[in-house]
Amino acid sequence: MPPMTRKTRIQPIEPVAEEDDNGYDRPSKSQLKREMHELQVLGQALVDLPKDALKRMPMPESLGDAVREARRITDHEGKRRQLQYVGRVMRSLTDDETAALRTALDAQRGVNKAATARLHWIERTREQLLASDDALTEFLRQHPDADIQEGRTLIRNARKEAQQGKPPRYFRELFQWIKAAGGASDSDDEAADDAGDDHDDDEA
């Protein structure tokens, strides 16, 4: 009977970090690929920003030109190539410049989130006011400075025009009345403009 041989488990080889001529570890290919993807995503986020929000981004001139050109192009393939170019320009930024852009984008997303929530509140309130007279009593209790007579008139007219199939003039005016009663400021309106791309332009 031949002697039993002991199986040796082969340990996986750990990847060794590459070193440059000065002895410092260089990023792995996977790390570089991941960083390039993150910058590409950041560039896409800039291209997708509303026009007014884009003006507030701390971008070097070269990046600003590349982003604006990407926004201008409508051809799918041309836009894809331009977005790749935006990514290459992004890779030329310093760490501080990239960090400043991320901070500004995070702040803009916060503004958009708050503005969107506010628009949804106005829309829900309008639906409630049109559905029930009790909703107006509750609204006036929470917003005592609102013009009661104007609110009642707008609600009555909005209901009537809906029944008659007329254009929603008073429906839109009721939106503005609720927004004003809720204490909308100039900054609220600016935020709503940035967040309202998917809302009725007449209501923003």
Swiss-Prot record:
Signal sequence bounds: none
Pfam families registered for this protein in UniProt: DarP
CDD domains in the record: YjgA-like
Matching InterPro entries: DarP, DarP_sf
GO terms for cellular component: cytosol
Region (Disordered): 1-31, 182-204
Family per record: Belongs to the DarP family.
Name of this chain's protein: Dual-action ribosomal maturation protein DarP
Protein source organism: Burkholderia orbicola (strain MC0-3)
